[in-house]
Amino acid sequence: MTNYFRSGDEIHYDCEIFEQTTSKGQGIRFYFDDITTLFPAEERVATIVYNVGLLINDAESIDDSEYLLNIDDPVIKTTGRAPMENAVKAIHMFKECVEALRHKYSNYKIAFACGWLDSRRHDAYRRVLSKMGFYETVVDDEPSLFRTYPAIDWIGYEQMKMAEMEEICDGE
């Protein structure tokens, strides 16, 4: 995970980047841009809001500057040689990224907004993310899939993880 900071005219971006390479040499990269300041102060009390960007491309050709410089108007071409493998890996990776960010900022509610470039991606994202509790709304004048996760209750979280481990052990 890498932090990128870019100062624009009046906008400050904090972008967390997670990446993996698939068996076919494709790079999957998630960009989590902190857009908390776009929301009114009363709506963002103890909340961090991320806009989620996804880039799948040849691992050697991924260039952060292409994404970060076009962050306000991202038109990025993505390719995929193994769409099913990439989709499965991206779903697992997204869940891991969400958990990592929730743990990093455990005292805050964390919200994620996922946009799309075309109707094909909208349908795919909606199908996957709606199963994860995301719903359609408008964020920063753009249609998005959105979800807010509560701050982590560490006692409840530890109890939940222990119960999961007991289920795994009982199943073996």
Regions found by a protein language model. Give the residues of each.
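Non-catalytic substrate-recognition and accessory regions of acyl/acetyltransferase enzymes
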Residues: 1-172
